[in-house]
Amino acid sequence: MIIGIWAEDEAGLIGEADKMPWSLPAEQQHFKETTMNQVILMGRKTFEGMNKRVLPGRISIILTRDETYQSDNEKVLIMHSPKEVLDWYHKQNKDLFITGGAEILALFESELELLYRTVVHEKFKGDTYFPSTFDFGRFKLVSEKFHDKDERNSYTFTIKKYEKVKQP
C-alpha cells in the first residue's frame, strides 16, 4: 500500500527551511510506530533538513533529480524518478510511506491509498505548504485522534486517517 504521512499546521504549513517548525514527541511516536519496518520516501531537501539522519528500522528512499547525489549510508536508496521508486516498490512486500516534502507528496498524489494527516492546532511561520491542489475528495475520513498539550507536547494536535474512496 502507498501511504501519505505528514504533519501540517492550521494553515497547511509543513516546513521551515526544510525542517518541521514544531517538536511534538507524541506525534513523532505515532510516526515511528506507523512507519516501523516499512519503507519511507522523502525528497532530498527533506533528508538534508534531517541532517541526513537515517531513521532506524526503516528502508529510506531519497528522491532527487540530481543524478550525482549519493549517500554515505548503505541503508539509504537514492532514486531519480517516481517510476524508479514505483518499479522498486512493486517488487517489495512492504508499505511505502510518502513523508514529504510538498513536491514529493504532489508527485505521488494519484498513487496514495491511505493518508495519515496530523494537524497541529497552531499557526507557524515557514516556507513550505502542503500542496493546495491536493484532492481530499478522493478520500474518506475514517478516524481522528485528538492529543492535548502536556509537559512534553507544547501544542494540541489531531491525527486524521483517511482511506481512498473505492470507485464503483
Curated annotation (Swiss-Prot):
SUPFAM superfamilies per UniProt: Dihydrofolate reductase-like (SSF53597)
**Keyword Oxidoreductase tagged:** yes
Could you tell me which InterPro entries the record lists for this protein?
Answer: DHFR, DHFR-like_dom_sf, DHFR_CS, DHFR_dom
Binding-site residues for substrate, renumbered to this chain = I5, W6, A7, E27, R58, T118
One annotated GO molecular function is: dihydrofolate reductase activity
Reactions catalysed, as given in the entry: (6S)-5,6,7,8-tetrahydrofolate + NADP(+) = 7,8-dihydrofolate + NADPH + H(+)
User: What are the annotated GO cellular component locations?
Assistant: cytosol
User: Per the UniProt record, which EC number(s) apply here?
Assistant: 1.5.1.3
Q: In which pathway does it act?
A: Cofactor biosynthesis; tetrahydrofolate biosynthesis; 5,6,7,8-tetrahydrofolate from 7,8-dihydrofolate: step 1/1
Report the top EC class in one word. oxidoreductase
What GO terms describe the biological role, i.e. biological process, of this protein? dihydrofolate metabolic process; folic acid metabolic process; one-carbon metabolic process; tetrahydrofolate biosynthetic process
Signal peptide residue numbers: none
The record's function comment reads: Key enzyme in folate metabolism. Catalyzes an essential reaction for de novo glycine and purine synthesis, and for DNA precursor synthesis.
Entry similarity comment: Belongs to the dihydrofolate reductase family.
Q: What is this protein called?
A: Dihydrofolate reductase
Organism in which the protein naturally occurs: Lactococcus lactis subsp. lactis (strain IL1403)
Name of encoding gene: folA
